[in-house]
Amino acid sequence: MLTLSEIEVKVNELAQKIGAPQNILPTYGYSEQTARPHVEVDSWAYYYVVAQSGQEVSRYTTRDIDQLLYKIFADVTFGFSVRYAEENHIENEDIRRLAFQRQVELLTLLSPQWGVRGFHEHAQILKQAPFDDDGSLRAVYWKSLRDQGYSVARANQMAHEKYPYPKEPKG
C-alpha cells in the first residue's frame, strides 16, 4: 500500500496534466467536512470518503491504487467537464453530450484505459436516461403555456406532445 504522501504526489502529478487546481482535489488523512472528498489508507485498503457536517456521505474502498486514482479523477474531470459544457453549450442540445465528450477526453489524457472506462460508464447512463436535445425547448414552451394560463397538467401534456421525451431504450 502506498502512503498518503505517496498518493498525494501521484494525484498532484496527474492533476497537473489537466490543470486541476488544488482546491478541487481531495485532502489526505482528514476531512474538511464540506463534502470535499478525502483519502484514507490503512494496511488493508485505500478509502475515498465524502463527509459533510459530521456525516459520512459515501465511502469507496479498494486495494488497487489505479482504481482509487480513477475514482478521484472521475470526480475531478466530471466537475471540469460540466463547467466546460456550460461555457460552450450548444443551443437545443443535451448538455451531457458535450460534458461526457469532454470528460472522456480528460480521462484519456490521464490514462487511455480510464477514457475507455468513462466512455462505458456514460453508455450505461444513457441506457437509462438517453440524451434529450428537446429538454430546453420543452421547458420554454411549457413556461409560455403556463404564462398563457394553461394548467400545469395541460401545459405538461401540450409541451410533451410538441417536444416528446426520447424513446425509452429497449432491453
Predicted regions and their residues:
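Intrinsically disordered, low-complexity, charge-dense segments enriched in Lys/Arg
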Residues: 83-171
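Amphipathic alpha-helical interaction segments
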Residues: 58, 75-83
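A short, exposed loop/beta-hairpin motif centered on an aromatic-Gly-Thr core
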Residues: 53-63
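N-terminal "first-domain core" detector
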Residues: 1-43
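Hydrophobic residues embedded in beta-strands of well-ordered beta-sheets
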Residues: 44-47, 56
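A short, charged, amphipathic alpha-helix used as a generic interaction element across diverse proteins
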Residues: 63-76
